Amino acid sequence: MSPPAAIFEPAVAPSPSLKAKVLVPETVPASGTSQTHLLDHFGGKWDDFKFAPIRESQVSRAMTRRYFQDLDKYAESDIVIVGAGSCGLSTAYVLAKARPDLKIAIIEASVSPGGGAWLGGQLFSAMVLRRPAEVFLNEIGVPFEEDPANPNFVVVKHASLFTSTLMSKVLSFPNVKLFNATAVEDLVTRPSASGDAKDTQIAGVVVNWTLVTLHHDDHSCMDPNTINAPVVISTTGHDGPFGAFCAKRLVSMNTVDKLGGMRGLDMNSAEDAIVKNTREVAKGLIIGGMELSEIDGFNRMGPTFGAMVLSGVKAAEEALKVFDQRQRECAE
């Protein structure tokens, strides 16, 4: 179940430059109607204001106790999503809503989840999504603008509005845990009965603090931790320091012969190809988003986000198709 939305009076404010209309009403707090009546509660009382007393060790214990409860709970997960960009978060949203019984762990190397979806292209703030990706915006309640003269795409006034809304919904699900500032260093594997590396079963991920991962070359060895899961979904983006990690690891494991390598920018070709081909590329490992372009040699798409969102939807669908079978195989 989605978390309850804050109740505000709607105020529609489309961008005049786009000659647009907002198809999902924007919501801003109306003066004097704050749901929590914060000014009524605190206003004019600051001279007597005081926080409840606390001892520093209470904070340390509460914080670490809660975190280690999550570590213990999600050490055996049902699905692990690697990468919390627009594709990974969309995947998590669909999965958590469809299957509240599944434990879903999201691993994100950065302190701040969201990947490149905090801004549009070239550090511009607006986000463009080609139709029919606006269906997902309606699903999560993100307002967007459309231009009647250009009906094939919609515009979100700030990419951060999309990312923050999606992230808040994902993290509100009780069956989802985000481990940020955490890097995936390797994959947990199981050999196939035939011994063929191409049939290797993926059975989880090997993790470490990102700061440790970044300094393996200049510090003494620091062993990692593990999370078991019958299905891993990798959405780490195109090649980079942490990008396309699982795709590259499949090659070094001989599960995939070689990477296709991302081609030049072609929005029309790239977005359709990424969504249609999001799939299980190895037993227990589904790859979506721009990471898939490194496997299959698809074009890059640049600053248009519809394929990232809908690749996430398809990744969730693919995961649900194979979950029961992969769970049985991993239990053997």
UniProtKB/Swiss-Prot annotation:
SUPFAM superfamilies: FAD/NAD(P)-binding domain (SSF51905). Belongs to the THI4 family. It is found in: Cytoplasm; Nucleus. Binds 1 Fe cation per subunit. Keywords: Cytoplasm, Iron, Metal-binding, NAD, Nucleus, Thiamine biosynthesis, Transferase. During the catalytic reaction, a sulfide is transferred from Cys-221 to a reaction intermediate, generating a dehydroalanine residue. The gene is thiA. One of its GO terms (biological process) is thiazole biosynthetic process. One of its GO terms (molecular function) is cysteine-dependent adenosine diphosphate thiazole synthase activity. Its EC number is 2.4.2.60. Its cofactor is Fe cation. Involved in biosynthesis of the thiamine precursor thiazole. Catalyzes the conversion of NAD and glycine to adenosine diphosphate 5-(2-hydroxyethyl)-4-methylthiazole-2-carboxylic acid (ADT), an adenylated thiazole intermediate. The reaction includes an iron-dependent sulfide transfer from a conserved cysteine residue of the protein to a thiazole intermediate. The enzyme can only undergo a single turnover, which suggests it is a suicide enzyme. May have additional roles in adaptation to various stress conditions and in DNA damage tolerance. Coiled coil: none annotated. This is Thiamine thiazole synthase. It catalyses: [ADP-thiazole synthase]-L-cysteine + glycine + NAD(+) = [ADP-thiazole synthase]-dehydroalanine + ADP-5-ethyl-4-methylthiazole-2-carboxylate + nicotinamide + 3 H2O + 2 H(+). NCBIfam families: sulfide-dependent adenosine diphosphate thiazole synthase. The modification 2,3-didehydroalanine (Cys) is found at C221.
